[in-house]
Amino acid sequence: AEEKEKVLLNSGIQKIFILPYKDSVVHSSIETFLDFLTNRNVRKIVVGKDFTFGDKGIGKPMDLLRREDRGCEVVIKDLMDFEYKGTKQKISSSAIKQLLKDKGLEEANKLLGYPYIRTGKVIKGHQNGRKIGFPTANMLPPKTKICLPEGVYQTVTLVEGKWYPSRTNIGNHPTIDEEDKTIIETNIFGVDFDLYGLNITVSFIRYLRDQTKFDSMDDLKRNLEQLKEEILLGSNNDSKRKA
């Protein structure tokens, strides 16, 4: 919820009111729900054609039009299509979640209108990355939102108000000290200070490769160097295009 609020505020919305999730709202009748909106002086409602409200989704977009005679404008939007792997689908939260599960990160980001993000507190790890020259900021997977598939991602990371290019691994680092749980590890390029305890935001740009168990530490280091060079080159090219 906090991440959604940040996205909405960054889009220019000045104030957010989150509808309380309680029986009186979830199981309300159509009229009770409409009165709830009227009592809060709602002046404009924008919903998709598949929007439902009230007990068991009894309320439909056309029911909202009843409030137009009370000075509330109602806009009902058509659902847009997108094509993925030769199949047309309606843009929906379910479709986006499926794309994320299928490693279709770039397509999911297009539909979201912004990159998938993960905000969390940096926790202490085994410092294995630091030992081979690639220190990471570690976070636990989110409990209340979909976690991306295991693998390596191109990311950018927000640390104390500044964005840095970065590489993120989601998995159990099988080459060194394989874990029995999934960790989100981000190697942030250009940050050389202690991040433990800080809240950071990782923005996921592109899926790079599957999690791989390398034959040796040297093979792993060579691959990480190659990925770093590729990510930094891409970041520089993006900066030039924006200039």
Region locations from a protein language model:
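N-terminal Rossmann-like or analogous alpha/beta NTP/dinucleotide-binding catalytic cores
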Residues: 1-69
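A non-catalytic, amphipathic alpha-helix used as a structural packing/dimerization or gating element
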Residues: 3, 107-114, 219-230
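Residue-level signal for inorganic ion chemistry
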Residues: 8, 45, 108, 155, ...
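Generic structural signal for residues in well-ordered beta-strands
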Residues: 16, 74-76, 202
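Residues at the C-termini of beta-strands that transition into short coil/loop
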Residues: 20, 78-80, 206
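Glycine-rich, Lys/Arg-enriched anion-binding loops that position phosphate/diphosphate groups
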Residues: 71-169
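Phosphate/ribose-recognition catalytic cores of enzymes acting on nucleotide-derived substrates
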Residues: 124-243
